[in-house]
UniProtKB/Swiss-Prot annotation:
Compartment(s) where it occurs, according to its Swiss-Prot or TrEMBL record: Cytoplasm
The entry's keywords: ATP-binding, Chaperone, Cytoplasm, Isomerase, Nucleotide-binding
GO biological process, one term: protein refolding
GO CC list: cytoplasm
EC number(s) given by UniProt: 5.6.1.7
UniProt-recorded name of the protein: Chaperonin GroEL 1
CDD domains in UniProt: GroEL
Protein's organism: Mycobacterium leprae (strain TN)
Principal subcellular localization: cytoplasm
């Protein structure tokens, strides 16, 4: 396919226009008084959402050069969502402000490379400053506060707080759609681990990018599966049962993986394959834990169980399995509660007699996974549109709560970013030339999230930013009440991990856009047909 090429200022301007179209659409959702965006769908009714990454994912622009800018900023939102599960709108408005300020400096003659280096140094300094003022999260009340701020819903916050408090920091919180109108919390047996699907073709829920298997069989395999003749007899038996299949193995590759993908696409067999976590003896022990949870056996030639020869009696089961690109949750495994309890007691006995601190730590992790169980938040609503929106809110709240446990919390509402600007003043004195200008650009960009939170709440953003800049650390605007005060005490908090991810990802994309000198895109088909030049119209 032939290409269109733009250079220098023309390329950067087109990309900035595209970035602004996406960011201006997303930023209206920021803050407790943020607005909604209605997304038309090719099939079914429209989706109403105030989730930044959901909006960003839907945007593709007609002009290919503008679309480059939009897709770059979209990557900020998706990367922040992948790392922290929240903070996507904050990341987007930060990136927009950085690019806008940076391009102004470049137009005035600043060196883009030096400017970008200054922006990167500023991002690192702000990241360190945020960690320095973080408050550790402990207890149900603190987790509830974080979840409530993220979801803008006290009921959701309370459910997430209760669920995470019960299953512990190593426990799993799963979100499902309810068959009733109520949103409620259930505790069930289950286990989760940090490995996702081996192919995106296994995805069954395209909105959440997850593979969801209801009432599946579970195949646990100690070794790598690459040969189709080895796997095919089992696939045929599972297909006859009419049930979906989860495969957990050292790896699945070659024709075995290809066959599983083809069967999933054709819907002959609903299946998902994931790698088993860990290595060596730890992997072996974890698979044995999974076997007890699911009521199955680990297929291992060393113990006389060869995959091509075994029947479905070695398979475990579960009520539900949810697999994303990063993790797997097995809910309500088919193993007996007595067997799980016996395994937990056995592991605790091993902890007592172990001389190795490392071994004790790893054994305790296994106990936490087995004993913690799974908290399932079942989301209900009157309409399908309301259900999707509410489920997104719950998922964001769970992600924010997990992030807050990892790195602590800071004052929310954009105030912490404005007040972290003080850390940049000292850094600026150590830099010269265009690198120092990068610090100035970043200093101004830090005001953007608070500015838009205030603007969306009907206030004058510039006035609010000026006022908060002069308040004591941790104080700021509570956009829900439109008052000022101690935000942590008022429960207006953000997870540090979320804010740091937003800062670092926004800086990375801004630096890329500022140093772009040439943009190359495919020539749109309709432009080729009419032999037009330049952008598509």
């Amino acid at each position: 396919m032939s290409k269109l090429i733009e250079y220098d200022e023309t390329a950067r301007h087109a990309m900035e226009v595209g970035m602004n179209k996406l960011a201006d659409t997303v930023r209206v959702t920021l803050g407790p008084r943020g607005r909604h965006v209605v997304l038309a769908k090719a099939f079914g009714g429209p989706t109403i959402t105030n989730d930044g990454v959901t909006v960003a994912r839907e945007i593709d622009l007609e002009d290919p050069f503008e679309n480059l800018g939009a897709q770059l900023v979209k990557s900020v939102a998706t990367k922040t969502n992948d790392v922290a599960g929240d903070g996507t709108t904050t990341a987007t408005v930060l990136a927009q402000a950085l690019v806008k300020g940076g391009l102004r400096m470049v137009a005035a003659g600043a060196n883009p490379v030096a400017l970008g280096a200054g922006i990167s140094k500023a991002a690192d300094a702000v990241s360190e400053a945020l960690l320095a003022v973080a408050t550790p999260v402990a207890g149900k009340d603190a987790i509830t506060q974080v979840a409530t701020v993220s979801s803008r819903d006290e009921q959701i916050g309370a459910l997430v707080g209760e669920g995470m408090n019960k299953v512990g920091t190593d426990g799993v919180v799963s979100v499902e759609e309810s068959s009733t109108l109520d949103t409620e919390l259930e505790f069930t047996e289950g286990v989760g681990f940090d490995k996702g699907f081996l192919s995106a073709y296994f995805v069954t829920d395209f909105d959440s990018q997850q593979a969801v298997l209801d009432d599946p069989l579970v195949l646990l395999h100690q070794e790598k599966i690459s040969s189709l003749p080895e796997l095919l007899p089992m696939l045929e038996k599972v297909t006859e049962s009419g049930k979906p299949l989860l495969i957990v193995a050292e790896d699945l590759e070659g024709e075995a993986l290809a066959t599983l993908v083809v069967n999933s696409i054709r819907k002959t067999l609903k299946a998902v394959a994931v790698k088993s976590p860990f290595f060596g003896d730890r992997r072996k022990a974890f698979l044995e834990d999974l076997a007890i949870v699911t009521g199955g056996q680990v297929v291992n030639p060393e113990t006389g169980l060869v995959l091509r020869e075994v029947g479905t009696d070695v398979l475990g089961s579960a009520r539900r399995v949810v697999v994303s690109k990063d993790d797997t949750i097995i809910v309500d495994g088919g193993g007996s509660n007595d067997a799980v309890a016996k395994r937990v007691n056995q592991l605790r006995a091993e902890i007592e007699v172990s001389d190795s601190e490392w071994d004790r730590e790893k054994l305790q992790e296994r106990v936490a996974k087995l004993a913690g169980g799974v908290a399932v938040i079942k989301v209900g609503a009157v309409t399908e549109t309301a259900l999707k929106k509410r489920k997104e809110s719950v998922e964001d709240a769970v992600a924010a709560a997990k992030a807050s446990i990892e790195e602590g919390i800071i004052a929310g509402g954009g105030s912490a970013l404005v007040q972290c600007g003080a850390a940049l003043k000292q850094l600026r004195t150590s830099l010269t030339g265009d690198e120092a200008l990068g610090i100035d650009v970043f200093f101004e960009a830090l005001k953007a999230p608070l500015y838009w939170i205030a603007t969306n709440a009907g206030l004058d953003g510039a006035v609010v930013v000026d006022k908060v800049s002069g308040l004591p650390a941790g104080h700021g605007l509570n956009a829900s009440t439109l008052g000022y005060g101690d935000l942590v005490a008022d429960g207006v908090v953000d997870p540090v991990k979320v804010t740091r991810s937003a800062v670092l990802n926004a800086a990375s994309v801004a630096r890329m856009m500022l140093t772009t000198e040439t943009a190359v895109v495919d020539k749109p088909a309709k432009t080729e047909e009419h032999d037009h030049h330049g952008h598509a119209h």
